Curated annotation (Swiss-Prot):
GO molecular-function term, one example from the UniProt record: structural constituent of ribosome
Gene coding for it: rps3ae
Keywords: Ribonucleoprotein, Ribosomal protein
Protein name per the record: Small ribosomal subunit protein eS1
Any Pfam family: Ribosomal_S3Ae
Lineage, uppermost ranks: Archaea, Thermoproteota, Thermoprotei, Thermoproteales, Thermoproteaceae
Length: 222
């Protein structure tokens, strides 16, 4: 009798899923990492929690701060843990919108780009693109000198900070202000921005957490 009831329940479940795939899905609330305030980022549907793991969520910094000046800053987070209907994330990257970057470079100025790989004191390895815009046109030698100064200041800041402190300074603009001070010693600057961040490698304990969660969900689903 019990076997018959199970078979009937299974048939009903299959019938529902054929009629409406959304019927079996649940809504999960995705949260920012604690070092970025732990605020709710989005609501996402999934039939199984396993299908959420390692999914990337992209939002504007404006969605977190409600500050209109933060609209051009895109943030990427990766889901690495699910607890009930709550999905926790880790930072994956940042990028300024193309329109905003284009608006920074004006006639009669020079653009100086620097790409630097840094490591925080808690083991996060990130590739960071810095954009500096000068007040007037400058030559190749000055561009190289600004690039070197900015790269050195950026590497020092990262190595002295954990990822939470570092990202907080990026998002608040204080890191860009420090890099501005470093670069203007070579030539007058109009603007310095952290244009892009990509996480190249997470600390071992961060990776192990994600691997354990994926493995646990695979076992639960089998």
């Amino acid at each position: 009798m019990a076997e018959k009831q199970k078979a009937v329940a299974k048939q009903e479940k299959v019938a529902i899923s054929k009629r409406d795939p959304w019927a079996l899905k649940k809504w999960y609330t995705v949260y920012a990492p604690s070092y970025l305030g732990g605020v709710a980022l989005a609501e996402v549907p999934a039939a199984e929690a396993q299908k959420l793991l390692l999914r990337t969520i992209e939002v504007s910094l404006y969605d977190i701060t409600k500050d209109i000046s933060h609209l051009p800053i895109k943030l990427r987070f990766q889901i690495h843990r699910v607890d009930g209907l709550k999905a926790a994330t880790r930072f994956k990257g940042l990028e300024l919108t193309r329109d905003y970057v284009r608006s920074l470079v004006r006639k009669g100025t020079s653009k100086v780009s620097a790409i630097v790989d840094v490591k925080t004191k808690d083991g996060w390895v990130m590739r960071i693109s810095i954009l500096a815009v000068t007040a007037h046109r400058i030559g190749t030698a000055q561009k190289s000198a600004i690039r070197k100064r900015v790269a050195e200041a950026l590497s020092r800041k990262a190595s002295d900070s954990d990822v939470g402190q570092f990202l907080k300074e990026v998002l608040e603009g204080s890191l860009a202000a420090e890099l501005f001070v470093a670069g203007k010693k070579i030539a007058p600057l109009r603007k310095v921005e952290v244009a892009k961040i990509k996480v190249l490698r997470y600390p071992p304990e961060e990776e192990q957490t994600a691997v354990r969660e994926v493995a646990a969900e695979e076992v639960a689903a089998s």
